[in-house]
Amino acid sequence: MVLVQDLLHPTAASEARKHKLKTLVQGPRSYFLDVKCPGCLNITTVFSHAQTAVTCESCSTVLCTPTGGKAKLSEGTSFRRK
């Protein structure tokens, strides 16, 4: 009997579809972001799955709002993944 799937060397596409704990190497899917405020250009570090609304420290503009999973960035904000 020949195996159709190689279990020791899975493809990147099949690993991306799996649950984070079912992959060959376990790891989180969350990350931190550097978000730039569109008004004052101040940079704030935000968690990707933030559960509270994050505001800019200097001008009090809302940078992201929480959803059920990932936080939704506000219109006009630019970001960079850390």
From Swiss-Prot:
- Known role: Component of the ribosome, a large ribonucleoprotein complex responsible for the synthesis of proteins in the cell. The small ribosomal subunit (SSU) binds messenger RNAs (mRNAs) and translates the encoded message by selecting cognate aminoacyl-transfer RNA (tRNA) molecules. The large subunit (LSU) contains the ribosomal catalytic site termed the peptidyl transferase center (PTC), which catalyzes the formation of peptide bonds, thereby polymerizing the amino acids delivered by tRNAs into a polypeptide chain.
Complex and partners: Component of the small ribosomal subunit (SSU). Mature yeast ribosomes consist of a small (40S) and a large (60S) subunit. The 40S small subunit contains 1 molecule of ribosomal RNA (18S rRNA) and 33 different proteins (encoded by 57 genes). The large 60S subunit contains 3 rRNA molecules (25S, 5.8S and 5S rRNA) and 46 different proteins (encoded by 81 genes).
Provide the record's note on post-translational modification.
Answer: The N-terminus is not modified.
Give its localization.
Cytoplasm
**Encoding gene, per UniProt annotation:** RPS27B
Q: What is this protein called?
A: Small ribosomal subunit protein eS27B
Xref: Pfam families: Ribosomal_S27e
Asked if the keyword tRNA processing belongs to this entry, the reply reads no
Q: List the taxonomic lineage.
A: Eukaryota, Fungi, Dikarya, Ascomycota, Saccharomycotina
